[in-house]
Design a protein with these regions (language model features):
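Signature for HUH/AEP ssDNA processing cores
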Residues: 1-79, 88-93, 145-194
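Metal-dependent DNA replication initiation modules
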Residues: 65-149, 161
Length: 194
C-alpha cells in the first residue's frame, strides 16, 4: 500500500509556480483560467527539470520515494510515461549517475531489463496536465498523480531520483552480481564420491 498523497488538482499557488517557468507567466495563468481543462507545454530547466519513466516503473519509483524516502514534488502521467518533477540541473547530472550505476546497458547486459529514464532539462519542454483533475481521466491521457500545491514545492535532486530508481529496479528485476552460467561448461556430480 502506497502513502502517496492523492492530490489530483493544482492549487492556485501550484498553478502560479508552473506558470513561472514561461516567459509570460500572467498570460499562462490567464490561458489556464479560460481553459482549465487544457494541458499546456512548459519549458524545463529554470524552475524544474523532469525525469520521465515508463508508467509502471515510475509508479514503483514514486512508491519508494513516499514509503521509504523523502517524498516527491509534483508528478504527472502523460502518454504512458510518468513525469517526475525534479530540481533544476537533475537532467544534466542524472544520466552520468545512471551510467555509473551501469543502468540499462546493451542487449546482453545484466541490467538490460531495467527501463530507460528520459531527462528533460534546459532547452526541453514537457506537456503538463490540466490544472483541474477532471472527473474521469482518459486512459493514456494526462493527469496529475501529485499536483503542485505550493508556490515553492520541494523537488528531488539527481541523487534522490537515482536512489528511488535503483530501489525500484531491485524490486522489479532480479539483477545478479554473478555472470550468467556458461551453458557449455562440464559439470560433474561430486555428491556420490566413494
Amino acid at each position: 500500500m502506497s502513502s502517496t498523497p492523492n492530490v489530483t488538482c493544482a492549487t492556485p499557488e501550484g498553478a502560479a509556480w508552473l506558470a513561472s517557468t514561461g516567459t509570460y507567466p500572467r498570460s499562462t495563468l490567464a490561458n489556464w483560467q479560460e481553459h482549465p481543462d487544457a494541458p499546456l507545454v512548459l519549458p524545463c530547466g529554470t524552475v524544474f527539470d523532469v525525469v520521465s519513466a515508463p508508467v509502471v516503473f515510475g509508479r514503483r519509483m514514486l512508491d519508494r520515494l513516499w514509503d521509504e524516502g523523502p517524498g516527491s514534488g509534483p508528478v504527472a502521467v502523460f502518454r504512458g510515461r510518468m513525469l517526475l518533477f525534479a530540481a533544476p540541473g537533475t537532467a544534466q547530472r542524472l544520466p552520468s549517475l545512471l551510467t555509473w550505476e551501469e543502468w540499462g546497458g546493451g542487449h546482453g547486459s545484466r541490467t538490460a531489463a531495467v527501463p530507460p529514464l528520459l531527462c528533460h532539462g534546459t532547452g526541453d519542454a514537457v506537456t503538463v496536465p490540466a490544472l483541474s483533475g477532471g472527473d474521469s481521466p482518459t486512459p493514456g491521457g494526462s493527469r496529475w498523480l501529485v499536483a503542485p500545491d505550493t508556490r515553492h514545492p520541494w523537488l528531488p535532486g539527481p541523487e534522490v531520483v537515482l536512489w528511488a530508481a535503483v530501489r525500484a529496479a531491485r524490486a522489479a528485476v532480479r539483477i545478479s552480481i554473478f555472470p550468467p552460467a556458461d551453458q557449455d561448461a562440464k559439470v560433474y556430480d561430486v555428491s556420490r564420491r566413494r
